[in-house]
């Protein structure tokens, strides 16, 4: 298989939704866990690609997307942009579920209504990112290559630091972030937060 990294194109959006779902259970396939396959992508992938496409890079294998890295240079500004331009239509489409609904779909709909958590902001690390690769794209150095491309783009924009969140069960991802030079910032509710200062 031939792999390559390229900038995001709007035609990639359905693939981003698919990859987000297929890696959405702490790195494992979450397809069977959600009735609505778009919910994860509505929160964790699509708004970044739509609102900050210049920070979205796609890994392709024989021309087909199989991974991505995306994020924002300024978490606070991104949160505000999502409130203005992204979540409104989704909140209309997905009403708040009943409290008795304990499904994963309901949890994601509640997250869409709550929006991005202000408590997850780290002032010294204003940017944040998400990276997901399908299993056949892992282990060949492409995750590192995507991360390097993203971090270089942040540095060129003068961003001083970046953070990310990862499920505590996603041991492989935690090791990858540590190898990339990320350090622990915080933890809680099954999530770990890592950060990296960027020299510009």
Predicted regions, residues:
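Conserved GNAT-fold acetyl-CoA-binding loop/helix
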Residues: 25-44, 80-95
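Conserved GNAT acetyl-CoA-binding A-motif
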Residues: 125-127, 154-167
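Conserved acetyl-CoA-binding loop-helix of GNAT-fold acetyltransferases
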Residues: 130, 139-153, 175-179
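Active-site rim helix/loop that mediates acceptor-substrate recognition in acyltransferases
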Residues: 34-56, 62
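Conserved acyl-donor/pantetheine-binding loop and adjacent beta-alpha core of acyl/acetyltransferases
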Residues: 75-130
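Conserved N-terminal entry element of GNAT/NAT acetyltransferase domains
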Residues: 1-11, 200
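Conserved catalytic-core motifs of GNAT/GCN5-like acyltransferases
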Residues: 76, 163-165, 178-196
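Conserved beta-strand in the GNAT
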Residues: 58, 64-73
């Amino acid at each position: 298989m031939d792999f390559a990294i390229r900038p995001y194109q709007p035609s990639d959006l359905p693939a981003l939704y698919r990859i987000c779902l297929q890696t959405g259970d702490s790195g494992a396939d979450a397809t069977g866990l959600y009735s609505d396959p778009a919910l994860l992508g509505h929160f964790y992938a699509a708004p970044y690609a739509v609102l900050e496409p210049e920070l979205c890079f796609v890994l392709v294998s024989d021309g087909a997307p199989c991974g991505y890295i995306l994020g924002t240079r300024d978490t606070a500004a991104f949160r505000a942009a999502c409130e203005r331009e992204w979540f409104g239509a989704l909140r209309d489409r997905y009403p708040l579920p009943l409290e008795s609904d304990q499904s994963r779909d309901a949890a994601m709909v509640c997250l869409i209504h709550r929006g991005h958590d202000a408590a997850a902001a780290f002032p010294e690390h204003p940017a944040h990112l998400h990276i997901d690769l399908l299993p056949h794209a892992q282990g060949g150095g492409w995750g590192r290559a995507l991360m390097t491309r993203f971090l270089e783009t942040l540095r060129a924009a003068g961003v001083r630091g970046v953070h990310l969140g990862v499920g505590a069960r996603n041991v492989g991802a935690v090791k990858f972030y540590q190898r990339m030079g990320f350090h622990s910032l915080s933890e809680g509710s099954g999530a770990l937060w890592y950060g990296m200062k960027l020299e510009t």
